[in-house]
Every structure is written in structure tokens, then in C-alpha cells.
Amino acid sequence: MGGLSIWHWLIVLLIVALVFGTKKLRNIGNDLGSAVKGFKDGMREGEAPADPQQLPRSGSVNVDAKDATRSSDSNKA
């Protein structure tokens, strides 16, 4: 009595189909499926490692050269 049997779910499905119509339900199903597919594709893109060649080079600083300059400046003083 507490659980819902298959007959209860079939009756609920029939009522929903009558209220909304099968075309509207099909559109909702397509929208939901494409949203799930887009989410999965987005998760796959996030997991893929970025190629080092594709990363932009932006103002990298050579730390060793900077330290060498500081030590030569302190020797002059």
C-alpha cells in the first residue's frame, strides 16, 4: 500500500501525456537530452590536459638572470 506499483506510474504517465501532449513532452525530452550531452562534453574538455604549445607566452621572467643582476649590483657598491 505504501509503495507505488507499475500501474500507478502508468496512470500518472497517461495523465501527464493528456495534460501536456506528446509533442511538448518530446520537446522537453530533447532539451533535457541535449543539456546532459552538453554537460558531459564540457566535463570532457575540462579533463583534457592543455598542450604546452597552445599556451600563450606572456612576459616570462628568468629568475636566475634577475638574481645575477642583484648580486653584481651589490658588488659595485
Swiss-Prot record:
GO terms for cellular component: TAT protein transport complex. Its main location: membrane. InterPro entries: TatA/B/E, TatA/E. One of its GO terms (molecular function) is protein transmembrane transporter activity. One of its GO terms (biological process) is protein transport by the Tat complex. Keywords: Cell inner membrane, Cell membrane, Membrane, Protein transport, Translocation, Transmembrane, Transmembrane helix, Transport. The keyword Transport applies. The chain crosses the membrane at residues 1-21. Residues 40-77 are annotated as: Disordered. It is a single-pass membrane protein. It comes from the Bacteria. The Tat system comprises two distinct complexes: a TatABC complex, containing multiple copies of TatA, TatB and TatC subunits, and a separate TatA complex, containing only TatA subunits. Substrates initially bind to the TatABC complex, which probably triggers association of the separate TatA complex to form the active translocon. NCBIfam families: PRK02958.1 (NF002813), tatAE (TIGR01411). Belongs to the TatA/E family. This is Sec-independent protein translocase protein TatA.
